[in-house]
Amino acid sequence: MSIRPDEITSILKNQIEQYQLEVEMAEVGTVTQVGDGIARIYGLDRAMAGELLEFPGDIYGMVLNLEEDNVGAVILGPYTHIKEGDQVKRTGRIVEVPVGEALIGRVVNAMGQPIDGKGPIQTDKFRPVESPAPGVVYRQPVNTPLQTGLKAIDSMVPIGRGQRELIIGDRQTGKTAIAVDTIINQKGQNVICIYVAIGQKASTVAGVVQRLEEAGAMEYTIVVMATASEPAPMLYIAPYAGCTMGEYFMYEQHRDVLCVYDDLSKHAAAYRELSLLLRRPPGREAYPGDVFYLHSRLLERAARLNDSLGGGSLTALPVIETQAGDVSAYIPTNVISITDGQIFLESDLFYAGQRPAINVGLSVSRVGGAAQIKAMKQVAGRLRLDLAQYRELAAFAQFGSDLDKATQARLARGERMMEILKQDQYQPMPVEEQVVVLYAAVNGFLDDLPVARVRAFEKDFLRFLRNERPEVLAGIREKRQLDDNLQEQLKKSIEDFKGSFTAAGES
């Protein structure tokens, strides 16, 4: 076989013309120590705080400690295959999560990856998990209500769009139930809801997701889940990721968003674990010195934006679990001081059958009053005062039986008011129905009913109004206040219904 130089030359020329020089530069470091979700890396002298690092096996980490001769990083995912001597690359990016409409109705992990088996999330939009809170000039006062559908909250501890309202109480007092009820009540209100589950059992979160699906609430809800079985870094990042997903709708689409963080006690514990493993100096209750900043930078991102930024809002409902009702512990006092009020749940009330178990005396809303509709203000002002007097008299009445008529009447009305504030789980109530029920209670229309029949009266009276007098409910819904004409109609409706209800009860 003869060698043809011209053919060889043409092949070589062709190869040279098609040759593309690709130089990939990467800053690489070496793992010197790894364990418990923490890695120490030597050689990444130019790494930034919060930067994303690439570990072998397509696992990422986040730089938290910048030290003299190494960096400390938390590993965002499984870390058992990472070993000493492995190479780690800088990415030059900070931690980002996917955002956008495609996430609505999905269950994702703290990195925004789907875990509900419904396929990949189709979005090309990303936002960094850490972003600065809007400044004072970019905000406007809270003035629009966010109805929870719970009589005790909407009347006495009202929440406005853009507010931060803490839900605090012992374990098993109904904290998650209040948050889930609030999400269900946003149906048809054009509010995007984000439920962030931090450090909970996977079975518990699955139950919440199922409940939301049954109520049709997953159509406007994103669930971000970092369960108890996941590494501490995932629990640490989860609430920031959820907040970022909400901020997209607030800033880009000018919509109202509700973000539930359930719960921040476990979030603080995860951060304490990371900080101690990174050898940061411990402070009170072994939490690091910046644990206040951990929660303040998250909750300050909740805001009601002014019209120049589109007027969207992000409302935060953080949850805190107390030990034996101790609200003066470190994390509870921190979060109470950051938020605009708190809903305090008591186990004694819960076990006594008062559900939701809200302690009205210790619960407060610092800005939500401005967001209440006028009709609710008209009935709720008296309600809080009457309940405060009832609690005082009830404590006093334990010591003596000789009570005058006026005191007995106050106690009787107080009992009926406490009864009317009870509400079944997953049964949120429209605000106009709350107003008519509370109007009947504060104006003494229930005083002559046996306490055991108060709930039945409420149920039947609302059915009567819906079927026989829908104009009363429609009037409150449209006017948002009780004018003289509406009050007359409402009084007449109560009296008409009460006659038939009392007669039915006696028969």
Swiss-Prot record:
GO cellular component term, pick one: proton-transporting ATP synthase complex
UniProt catalytic activity: ATP + H2O + 4 H(+)(in) = ADP + phosphate + 5 H(+)(out)
GO molecular function per UniProt: ADP binding; ATP binding; proton-transporting ATP synthase activity, rotational mechanism
Site (Required for activity): S363
Binding-site positions, ATP: G169, D170, R171, Q172, T173, G174, K175, T176
Location in or out of the cell: Cell membrane
Topology of this chain in the membrane: Peripheral membrane protein
EC number(s) per entry: 7.1.2.2
Keywords: ATP synthesis, ATP-binding, Cell membrane, CF(1), Hydrogen ion transport, Ion transport, Membrane, Nucleotide-binding, Translocase, Transport
Biological function: Produces ATP from ADP in the presence of a proton gradient across the membrane. The alpha chain is a regulatory subunit.
SUBUNIT field: F-type ATPases have 2 components, CF(1) - the catalytic core - and CF(0) - the membrane proton channel. CF(1) has five subunits: alpha(3), beta(3), gamma(1), delta(1), epsilon(1). CF(0) has three main subunits: a(1), b(2) and c(9-12). The alpha and beta chains form an alternating ring which encloses part of the gamma chain. CF(1) is attached to CF(0) by a central stalk formed by the gamma and epsilon chains, while a peripheral stalk is formed by the delta and b chains.
PANTHER family linked to this entry: ATP SYNTHASE SUBUNIT ALPHA, MITOCHONDRIAL (PTHR48082:SF2)
Family: Belongs to the ATPase alpha/beta chains family.
Alphabetical list of NCBIfam families matching this protein: atpA, PRK13343.1
Name under which the protein is recorded: ATP synthase subunit alpha
Organism field: Moorella thermoacetica (strain ATCC 39073 / JCM 9320)
This protein's encoding gene: atpA
